[in-house]
Curated annotation (Swiss-Prot):
Specifically methylates the N4 position of cytidine in position 1402 (C1402) of 16S rRNA. Its main location: cytoplasm. This is Ribosomal RNA small subunit methyltransferase H. GO terms for cellular component: cytoplasm. It comes from Gemmatimonas aurantiaca (strain DSM 14586 / JCM 11422 / NBRC 100505 / T-27). It is found in: Cytoplasm.
């Protein structure tokens, strides 16, 4: 969901052009109806709307949704665009019918540039920024509350799984030790704990990795994605395309494995002894390898460096 640069006027106004926009447009070129599950600033959706595509945009962030509706108000008034406040992992709770089908479905995971640039949202390690990191009002705890209450063993597992941190146990122990003296309240508190473990030479890449891990836990991102994948697959029309941009190895692994399983000749559960799917794959994987941002795009915005795009087509 990470944008790259300001767009020329007439394309998307003063907003940023989303990562891998041309690749997404190519993969969903035949779509006449699109579900944008991570509306954010509305960059992808704006491009689809300009082509005459009907778009339903979903976001769990009320502020992001309000801004997108203001930006795309003309399309909403005409009926071409519909905005829905919802978590893409729980569309039924937002009133989506099981009969709602789309030619294209897009997920641009991670934090939007608008969320990232707003220091009050607490997604960055800016000095004095609050430890919040909630993408929407549906998160149970903010980052500070999580760090102040989570069990040391669970925190160690979180840092190991989501940040690939080899010193996860030591870092968890340091966080627990510090919170006993004073609760974590700002980004500085977490940065100081990271430095205490990784040393004075630790810097922005280390902070970003740990902050990302905490954010993933706060918003239940990997579990939500895992639950959503089969449900979104079933919302595709025949020949419809599911395109997903990820920024974390755990996200990409979930997407890759799901697409592989859905493209197999037999999709019955492993423990089912008799095949009932008749040996027909559910569809085919469009991207054998993930598509990355070009060097030019990365030069314009380093946030695009970790973007990985995979796409799958329904039979």
């Amino acid at each position: 969901m990470t944008p790259v640069r300001s767009a020329p006027s007439g394309r998307t106004g003063t907003y940023h052009v989303p990562v891998l926009l041309s690749e997404i447009e190519t993969m969903l070129a035949n779509a006449t109806t699109v579900l944008d599950c991570t509306l954010g600033g509305g960059g992808h959706t704006a491009a689809f709307l300009e082509r005459g595509v009907r778009v339903t945009g979903v976001d769990r962030d009320p502020r992001a949704l309000a801004a997108a509706r203001e930006r795309l108000g003309e399309y909403e008034r005409s009926g071409q665009f519909r905005a829905v406040l919802a978590n893409y992992a729980a569309l039924e709770e937002a009133g989506f019918s099981t009969d709602d089908r789309f030619d294209g479905i897009l997920l641009d995971l991670g934090v939007s540039s608008h969320q990232f640039d707003d220091a009050s949202r607490g997604f960055t390690f800016r000095e004095g920024a609050p430890l919040d990191m909630r993408m929407g009002t549906d998160a149970d705890l903010d980052a500070g509350e999580l760090l102040n209450t989570i069990d040391e063993v669970d925190l160690s597992a979180l840092l190991r799984a989501y940040a690939d941190e080899p010193r996860a146990a030591r870092m968890a122990r340091e966080i627990v030790r510090r919170r006993e003296r004073r609760p974590f309240a700002t980004a500085d508190d977490l940065v100081d704990a990271i430095r205490a473990v990784l040393g004075p030479r630790s810097g922005a890449p280390d902070f970003a990795r740990i902050f990302q891990a905490v954010r993933i836990a706060v918003n239940d991102e990997l579990s939500g994605l895992e639950r959503a994948l089969p449900a979104l697959r079933d919302r595709l029309t025949p020949g419809g395309v599911l395109a997903i941009i990820s920024y974390h190895s755990g996200e990409d692994r979930l997407v890759k494995n799901a697409f592989r399983d859905w493209s197999a000749s037999c999709v019955c559960p492993p423990r089912q002894f008799v095949c009932t799917c008749r040996g027909r794959p559910l569809g085919d994987t469009i991207t054998r390898k993930p598509v990355s941002a070009t060097e030019q795009e990365i030069d314009q915005n380093t946030r695009a460096r970790s973007a990985r795009l995979r796409a799958w087509r329904s039979a």
